[in-house]
């Protein structure tokens, strides 16, 4: 099991980063908030979890152990795979997720694309007493950029998560045309989080 990766950041994309450690480049799938802390060419460390399947081994990276532990807790729930667990942590930061579980807030969980009412109820039932008390928020906001500059990146990330291109474009445009983009600058990670939340509501 690989618990963390430290080294030079070779690449930062919307859903993953490549970090070179001991001469080996590791592709690490990560949440928008974790990716927002990385800069190409700089040194970085991500706490990781490895998911092993019959035909693959995939690393998932997080800014801290709390997010990694929540990811692993979500994976323990029947019907929740890595993609859905990562989408949950993209929509809700650690503190918000813990609060939703503590409050049995099914409605908040159904904002995550792919989680319906029954799935949310199952997550609450199985994790409410396992995740511990609500801690401080670890949400990191990415560097602001012009809305037009991030549109293509957000659409690409949504398509990568399994949404149809038209659906992804409409959600992204709605986010950038709304309150988030009214000042002409928006963080890519914030736009992606908002689009995911919107898609969860309109599913």
UniProtKB/Swiss-Prot annotation:
Keywords: Cytoplasm, DNA damage, DNA recombination, DNA repair, DNA-binding
Binding site for DNA: 79-80, 83, 114-116, 118
InterPro entries the record matches: DNA_helicase_Holl-junc_RuvA_I, Hlx-hairpin-Hlx_DNA-bd_motif, NA-bd_OB-fold, RuvA, RuvA_2-like, RuvA_C, RuvA_C_sf
Region described as Domain I: 1-65
Pfam families: HHH_5, RuvA_C, RuvA_N
Localisation per UniProt entry: Cytoplasm
Keyword Electron transport: no
HAMAP family per the UniProt record, alphabetical: DNA_HJ_migration_RuvA
Domain topic, free-text comment: Has three domains with a flexible linker between the domains II and III and assumes an 'L' shape. Domain III is highly mobile and contacts RuvB.
Complex formation: Homotetramer, forms a dimer of homotetramers around Holliday junction DNA. The tetramers make direct protein-protein contact, DNA contacts both tetramers. Forms a complex with RuvB. Forms an RuvA(8)-RuvB(12)-Holliday junction (HJ) complex. HJ DNA is sandwiched between 2 RuvA tetramers; dsDNA enters through RuvA and exits via RuvB. An RuvB hexamer assembles on each DNA strand where it exits the tetramer. Each RuvB hexamer is contacted by two RuvA subunits (via domain III) on 2 adjacent RuvB subunits; this complex drives branch migration.
Family note: Belongs to the RuvA family.
Name used for this protein in its record: Holliday junction branch migration complex subunit RuvA
Species per Swiss-Prot/TrEMBL record: Mycobacterium leprae (strain TN)
Gene expressing this chain: ruvA
